[in-house]
C-alpha cells in the first residue's frame, strides 16, 4: 500500500482582494470536490488577520496530486490576480510528482519536501460515520 501524499501551501492575499480570494477558493473547492473523488481531504483556511490563506490537501498517493494539478490548471494560471505568488510557502510530505516540482521550478517557488515515510496510518472517518 502506498502512503498518502500531503500538500500544504500558504499564500499572501493581495491587498483589496480578500472577497475575490474567498470567491475563487470556493470555486476551486467545488471543482475539486466534483472532479477528484479520490482526494481524501481538501481545505482552505484564512489567518486571523485575513491576509494569508493556507491550503491543506491529503491525497491517497502522489499520482493523485498530479491529477489535481491538471484539474486546477486554469485556476493556477489566474491565481496571481489575487495572490502574491512570490510569498508562498509549500510543504510536501511524500515524493512529489514531476508536474509539481516542474511547476515550483517554473515559478521559482520552494518546496519544503519530506519525502521519506516513516510510519503512520489513515482512517476513512467519513465512511465510518455513515455506517
Predicted feature residues:
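A short, acidic, amphipathic alpha-helical segment used as a generic capping/interface helix at domain edges
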Residues: 73-77
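Short S/T/G/P-rich N-terminal loop/turn motif that feeds into the first structured element of a domain
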Residues: 1-53, 60-71, 81-131
Amino acid at each position: 500500500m502506498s502512503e498518502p501524499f500531503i500538500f500544504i501551501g500558504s499564500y499572501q492575499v493581495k491587498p483589496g482582494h480578500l472577497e475575490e480570494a474567498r470567491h475563487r477558493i470556493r470555486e476551486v473547492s467545488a471543482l475539486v470536490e466534483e472532479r477528484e473523488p479520490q482526494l481524501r481531504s481538501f481545505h482552505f483556511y484564512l489567518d486571523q488577520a485575513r491576509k494569508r490563506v493556507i491550503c491543506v490537501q491529503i491525497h491517497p498517493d502522489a499520482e493523485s496530486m498530479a491529477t489535481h494539478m491538471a484539474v486546477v490548471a486554469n485556476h493556477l494560471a489566474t491565481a496571481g490576480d489575487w495572490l502574491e505568488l512570490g510569498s508562498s510557502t509549500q510543504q510536501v510530505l511524500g515524493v512529489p510528482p514531476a508536474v509539481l516540482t516542474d511547476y515550483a521550478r517554473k515559478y521559482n517557488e520552494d518546496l519544503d519536501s519530506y519525502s521519506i515515510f516513516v510510519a503512520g496510518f489513515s482512517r476513512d472517518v467519513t465512511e465510518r460515520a455513515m455506517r
